[in-house]
Amino acid sequence: MEIGTTGAVGAAPQFSVPRRPGYGTMGKPIKLLANCFQVDIPKMDVYLYDVDIKPEKCPRRVNREVVDSMVQHFKVTIFGDRRPVYDGKKSLYTAQPLPVASAGVDLDVTLPGEGGKDRIFKVTIKFVSLVSWHMLHEVLTGRSTPDPLELDKPISTNPVHAVDVVLRHLPSMRYTPVGRSFFSSPEGYDHPLGGGREVWFGFHQSVRPAMWKMMLNIDVSATAFYKAQPVIQFMCEVLDIHNIDEQPRPLTDSHRVKFTKEIKGLKVEVTHCGTMRRKYRVCNVTRRPASHQTFPLQLENGQTVERTVAQYFREKYNLQLKYPHLPCLQVGQEQKHTYLPLEVCNIVAGQRCIKKLTDNQTSTMIKATARSAPDRQEEISRLVRSANYNSDPFVQEFQFRVRDEMAEVTGRVLPAPMLQYGGRNRTVATPSHGVWDMRGKQFHTGVEIKMWAIACFATQRQCREEVLKGFTDQLRKISKDAGMPIQGQPCFCKYAQGADNVEPMFRHLKNTYAGLQLIIVILPGKTPVYAEVKRVGDTLLGMATQCVQVKNVVKTSPQTLSNLCLKINVKLGGINNILVPHQRPSVFQQPVIFLGADVTHPPAGDGKKPSIAAVVGSMDAHPSRYCATVRVQRPRQEVIQDLASMVRELLIQFYKSTHYKPTRIIFYRDGVSEGQFRQVLYYELLAIREACISLEKEYQPGITYIVVQKRHHTRLFCADRAERVGRSGNIPAGTTVDTDITHPYEFDFYLCSHAGIQGTSRPSHYYVLWDDNCFTADEFQLLTYQLCHTYVRCTRSVSIPAPAYYAHLVAFRARYHLVDKEHDSAEGSHVSGQSNGRDPQALAKAVQIHHDTLRTMYFA
């Protein structure tokens, strides 16, 4: 986080972020290593210059080449032996002043262009200000805090940004930068993902202010890139064509649409002009093949004639197309009609894939990138040694020193809470390493199921009647043991086919069987039926549904059935377990509501779809039952637009459920990046207050607002081998860190609340941005850890508190409610939901939950 990027818009001083209330002391100490490396920075001032490059809007890569060439070219007159560092946009830093007038200096820079033509750039350099690293030392040691007005200055004058640019300058020239990571093309290894994509490995690097020092956070990182290959091969991969020569016919419409979707927006280079490898961006794929696709060609005598692409290539380049029956790529601007046959194009190397990966690609990616904690630790250490920062001439220029051993940190393993079950003997479960067992225990409050139905959307061949019968018998046995008795056989059990049959069947059930509590739906693998079941059940008719994959019906296991019962009991109003009351923190002594909030955005490149905001609120004192609210809002908008009305609904609902008004509101907010802290806090805190005042003028409960972050690159490792847990050698569940690698004076901490099963555990990062309730560090860390044990869908502690997790589920479910049957396939992992042309009212209505479902945990 930039030093002090919090506070509020206009840096209103009343919105300064709470200072750390002290350090946590609870739990058993554990020695850890963090992938943070100390950077020693001199107490000096550096010089910031503004760089203006014309023509504007060049990619950063080009800007860097321009600046690099400029430094070489004007070495004698301006730069001498200085080694400036540059951020790829507007900011250039030097350790010594440059001999340029205060009005700035204009320079001409030439880069070799394509086809022997030079490209000329005009560069203006102008001094802006000194950036002080003295101040940085004062802040890091906690001797001074930035003045709130400092926070509104441009990022370039921020001393942390300057440190970041110095350490990023050389890698940005050497590798392909993506966000805060660097990648290089795979040499000597090959990790295809299918569909023309492959895995590139690289590293993440970012600078963070920590206690007493600056830290460089380094992590191994992987992402999907498009494979550099002929477009014909790319097409074959995307369309699963094994041999292009066996495809003598033009592409079918559905194939062409699929191919267009994948290649649109990618850069290709041509191969038919010798060494002139001109690059183009694809804007479309033609409907007609190269043998029929025409364009107006101007002859030398000024006459214009229609030519097909195939004819033109034969006449102009003496090139007989091998695949004239395949379509052409339309490149450049759509109105210009530039067509290229597929066979003369290659995919340009180094293009990152921002489109969503398919399920298969995602699982291949996870397999290729998951590393056990000790392996990852070793890999990061190797990376830092080979990066050899201290020999980087730019790091030397600014007199930095980067330590090459990981930061040693003392963490604490918090005690796990005990969980109260029900039944006659009211047993208590004590988690061990984040896991506990329900065998021999009964739900705290089990529901009795008297009337239920089964709808099987798998075929009779996939799931025979006796298999169904076996499944229901097993389910009834397990549910009885768990204290959720399912009485008798289902009142209805029928086979059906396809999403179109869901609504008529459910309507029939609702009208025929009064008091029907549950429909169990059996699905044949990945299918649009799921989205339709949830749309009809959650939004249209208000019926509880539980989907089961056919493979889990054919081959049942007690574990799967038990997990089904966890979900069913909660959907029907039961309570699986509660935190043992006497060990909960003191915040529970008065009525308190826990809110979780999340905004999910449409996949990249999908500009038309809305973002979805979800807020859930606890409805009892345990807290175990939650109620959901959900809204659609403008795409990519991070602030929850309608938060005041959502919180108001939840407060009213809490009052109806408990007959109390909460005196405290604990708000866990997921999915905010550090650059947005101030903006989101300012808007949302006021919205929560507004919700309270709208209910009663004098109603002012204490609000605690916490951001939960999972998407960061801090990893923690056990320093002592003996403390490693499980097959992947991770840190134990409950590991907490609030010193050394955390903020110099703001209230943040890392907590790894789950047991890592695969790969390296990622601790969640909690940032308390507002706290009227004056929590101590211990109280708040323990509360957060306990809430990670209240997630109803499994008997494990999860990686973020239950309310934040539920908000995520609610938003994700709303994506399914938005699937528009006419236009969307809801296929693959792409729940698409552009409600093509549906207006905002229609979208808002589509995610509205039926009043019978509203008060249930339908999302469980």
From Swiss-Prot:
One GO process term, biological-process aspect: miRNA-mediated gene silencing by inhibition of translation
Keywords on record: Cytoplasm, Endonuclease, Hydrolase, Metal-binding, Nuclease, Ribonucleoprotein, RNA-binding, RNA-mediated gene silencing, Translation regulation
Keyword Ribosomal protein: no
Residue span(s) of domain PAZ: 230-349
Any single Gene Ontology cellular-component annotation: cytoplasmic ribonucleoprotein granule
Stretches assigned to the Piwi domain: 518-819
Region (Interaction with guide RNA): 530-567, 758-805
Signal sequence bounds: none
Subcellular location as annotated: Cytoplasm, P-body
Catalytic activity: Endonucleolytic cleavage to 5'-phosphomonoester
EC code(s) of this entry: 3.1.26.n2
CDD domains in alphabetical order: PAZ_argonaute_like, Piwi_ago-like
Keyword field contains Membrane: no
SUPFAM superfamilies documented for this protein: PAZ domain, Ribonuclease H-like
Broad class of where this protein is predominantly found: cytoplasm
Residues at which a divalent metal cation binds: 598, 638, 670, 808
Family: Belongs to the argonaute family. Ago subfamily.
Function according to Swiss-Prot or TrEMBL: Required for RNA-mediated gene silencing (RNAi). Binds to short RNAs such as microRNAs (miRNAs) and represses the translation of mRNAs which are complementary to them. Possesses RNA slicer activity but only on select RNAs bearing 5'- and 3'-flanking sequences to the region of guide-target complementarity.
Name this polypeptide is given: Protein argonaute-3
Native organism: Danio rerio (Zebrafish)
Gene: ago3
